Amino acid sequence: MRKLVVPNVFFEEAAEALREGKSVRLHVDGQSMYPFIRGGEDEIEVVPYDGVTPPEPWCCPFYQWGGNYMIHRFIGMNGEKWRMLGDGNLYRIEEVPQREIIGLLRTIYHTDGTEQDCRDSRWLRRAQWWYRLRSIRRFLIPLFRLLRI
């Protein structure tokens, strides 16, 4: 199977649709949100963000940072900036102005046919625990990949 890398211009179009109030469904690549999102396999639904509502703890905003569009976990605030960390990342925290937040992750569509509502309180609590395990993620992530968890 040939891998197709979609240029960032596609995500610009998705961002524009979100700004127009439309939801978008995207096939994601990359491993920065593993194990919650499997890059190259899962699809996600992103809904528009109103630009006003305070973020729900552990939600996953869609935003532009460093010229790229991303979905990472919201982990807190630093003044007016939202702090983000990918579930598969160990150290790099992005600080994003609220005006750069375009949408919020609503649903993950897994390849096995299951769907994950990203507003579900149990899912958000699991994300919080995963964040607390940052110090041992370097060992857990390879183990999870090996076991296909």
What is each residue range found by the language model?
Residues M1-I149:
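Extended hydrophobic leader/signal-anchor segments used for secretion and membrane insertion
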